[in-house]
Amino acid sequence: ALDIGCGTGNLAIPLAKRLRRVDALDFSAGMLRQLEENRRAAGVDNLRVHALSWTDSWEAVPVADLVICSRALGVEDLRGALEKMTRWARRRCYATLHAAGDFLGDDVRAALGREVAPRPGYIYAVNMLYQMGFPARVDFLKSTGGMTYADAGQFLEAVRWRIGGLSAADERRLGRVFGALPQTGDGRRRYRHEFVWALLSWEKPGP
């Protein structure tokens, strides 16, 4: 199997316990360092790690019967990423993409007082795959999660990453939102959000 955008190994390590070999690919050195620690702790020795991005050459990465990509298709060239996934698969691909919900909840949107343009959703990928000759099956997964922040600055930076620039008035209002968030045991504040993810799967026809 090949896990693209493997992060710290949440999928790659369990897969490696069940399969003969797993290749895990991510561009983040920090994520891969944590994956190596998690791999050793799990006693897994059939997991190969590749420090690569979507745009790098994958010449050293072997093709696999199964290719997965969980929440790592937020790329500029979505069609190119889907094509690359499919080229590296012998049999089947799975990918999860955003379907509904957002990091920016109603409280943040109200504080900003303006509409935030949604990001391209899963339907773009479904249409692209259909055009490529791979009609995808779609299932939906609900997810409740959240992030913790040590201070308002971290929270503001997370919002800024999502929407771009913030005015001084935006920062003041968002600071009040942050101050009202529940605290965790270590004094950080937790922002909760809910998502719906689309699980896309498609097969490659045999030779």
Residue ranges and their predicted role:
Residues 5-7:
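Class I SAM-dependent methyltransferase "Motif I" SAM/SAH-binding loop
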Residues 10, 17-55:
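Class I SAM-dependent methyltransferase SAM/SAH-binding core
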Residues 56-61:
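Short conserved loop adjoining the S-adenosyl-L-methionine
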Residues 65-79:
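A short SAM/SAH-binding and catalytic strip from SAM-dependent methyltransferases
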Residues 90-100:
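Conserved beta-strand signature within the Rossmann-like core of class I S-adenosyl-L-methionine
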Residues 98-116:
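Short, glycine-/aromatic-enriched active-site segment of Class I SAM-dependent methyltransferases
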Residues 118-133:
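Short alpha-helix
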Residues 137-207:
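Conserved Class I S-adenosyl-L-methionine
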